[in-house]
Amino acid sequence: MSADMAAQSESGEGGDDGRADGGLGDRLVYLAVLSRPRFWLYLAGPVVVGVAAAASALADLFGLEPVALFAYFLVPANVFLYGVNDVFDADVDEANPKKDDREARWRGDPVNTVVVAASGLLGVGLFAVAPRVAWPWLAAHFFLAVEYSAPPFRFKTTPLLDSVSNGLYVLPGVAAYAAVSGSNPPMLAVAGAWLWTMGMHTFSAIPDIEPDREAGIRTTATALGERRTYWYCAATWVLAAVAFAAVDLRLGALLAAYPVVVLGIVAAGVDVDRAYWWYPVINTVVGMLITLGALWRLVNG
């Protein structure tokens, strides 16, 4: 599945107005591209980390709660999150170059709207599966997933709140930890993860600075400008590393990679449109190392 295929469909090859559907295969390709496959692990990855950190026995890794949470946050949650985003950003995205190749512009037909809404409603089933200690974290995730893009709050259009609200990405992992362990994770770990998402979100908004300014949208990145946004990201990632180091020095050392990388990007003059696509790989590697460390502890004590 490629963004090129979705782009072909949008350009009119699937229908006369560029928005008509060329069939089931075309629609599935479009929905897959809309869900940002490169970023699927941004929601599902924290679930894996949370489950591994909370497990006290190998059987805990494969219970109903962790499997259901991982399955939902791998694909349906991404269809919902990015679908809501694209619905309310349709006008802005007309001028966004990211939508030309790697992402898809919103097709406003009823079937796609129903699929996005159904993906959100599917998440309600998690409340029947997860214990009550996980409910507040799940509720917070769904609230932020909607209100980040949708009125009345539309956090993404308010500097700083757009950054802070992206804690929604770690909340599935917090919910998973709570579901498996029956208690909440260390709050310093939650704070560190939240700061990490603030940096990630604001870094990812750098390529959107000009399209957002042209559309009159104010974000942390548009308020700061490209250069100062790099420093903002570095600062949030340093604080994230400090918070994680207070939980475990090894975690702090891993998170220290983020400010080092962003400072390297600035020093080397790497184009942000190129560096933007490095972070899914970096996040996957860091998340994998944290998970493997937790599994090592689980197996070896």
Curated annotation (Swiss-Prot):
It is found in: Cell membrane. Its main location: membrane. It catalyses: all-trans-lycopene + dimethylallyl diphosphate + H2O = dihydroisopentenyldehydrorhodopin + diphosphate; isopentenyldehydrorhodopin + dimethylallyl diphosphate + H2O = dihydrobisanhydrobacterioruberin + diphosphate. GO terms for molecular function: transferase activity, transferring alkyl or aryl (other than methyl) groups. It comes from the Archaea. One of its GO terms (biological process) is carotenoid biosynthetic process. Involved in the biosynthesis of the acyclic C50 carotenoid bacterioruberin (BR). The enzyme acts at both ends of the substrate, and catalyzes the conversion of lycopene to the C(45) intermediate dihydroisopentenyldehydrorhodopin (DH-IDR) and the conversion of isopentenyldehydrorhodopin (IDR) to the C(50) carotenoid dihydrobisanhydrobacterioruberin (DH-BABR). This is Lycopene elongase/hydratase. The gene is lye.
